[in-house]
Amino acid sequence: MAISQISVFVENRPGRLADITAVLAKNSIDIRALSVADTSDYGILRLIVNDPKSAVEALRSEGMTASVTQVLGIIIPDEPGGLARAIKVLSDAQISVEYAYAFITPSVGNAYVIIRVEDNDKASEILKGAGIELIEQDDIFKK
């Protein structure tokens, strides 16, 4: 149930994010979620897109450094404590979350959270056992 996430190396300079998103738009790539982690010189742009393979090919053809990482997507109630419950389930199983970011869903009352863990299979099993629903790549783009 892993989701393919695109990671793009981004130099910290004006216009770089615009360049990346323009390449994706030109190639009909739909961005559903993104997160930027930065340092003083560069950042990592993480994206959930409708066609990860084509996105990476398009970015690389423009000389950009891009790769695919497998992450998990979970559905949480859009209410106080919804995320805390899912994270506690992982913590209780000694699974560390390397990073996470959330975005809205077309489903009223829920949110999607992307999480990066060391062992997707183990985390999936633990989350499912606790009644936490996982999502697949195609689910993210259903209207």
Predicted segment positions?
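A conserved regulatory-domain signal marking ACT and ACT-like small-molecule sensing domains
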Residues: 1-143
